[in-house]
Amino acid sequence: MSARYLVVATKEELYLPIAKKERNRIPIVTGVGGTNVIKALRDLPRDADILNVGYCGSPCFPVGEVICVQYTKLLHPGVHFKEDIFELRGSSSGVTCLTSGDFVTDPHGIPPNSIVDMELAYIAAFGFEKTSAVKYVSDNLNLNEYETCLKK
């Protein structure tokens, strides 16, 4: 049986309700963004069972909504080439998590039924096939909303 990990970007995300329920998983705090994910997870076996819990933004869902993610891919606004889409385990929600290298504040180009984060597609692209994800909508692609959410 492969090891089970709870992967979050920040220590604060360890206190989200779903994360608190996952005490049987080994916690890994990666830091925010793709480069930090790569550094933190590069030595894990690719058959590791990963649950990614964290914050996301979305123009499609209300702040406070809890989302089980079915798909993830990189977000490259203005780039028109085919991106790999990764299907995650444990969800049939139809929700896609778009992973960006920057905080996204413009909802233009964000498809319906989508959320935006800064880590998930990197985890999936790294070859971790036993990955599932639960995201908390912290903002509607608004930096002030996000910062207010973190203060709660």
Per-range role (PLM):
Residues 7-12:
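Gly/serine-rich nucleotide phosphate-binding loop at the start of the catalytic core
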Residues 13-152:
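Glycine-rich phosphate- or other oxyanion-binding loops that anchor nucleotides, phosphorylated ligands
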Residues 1-6:
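Extreme N-terminal starter segment of soluble prokaryotic enzymes
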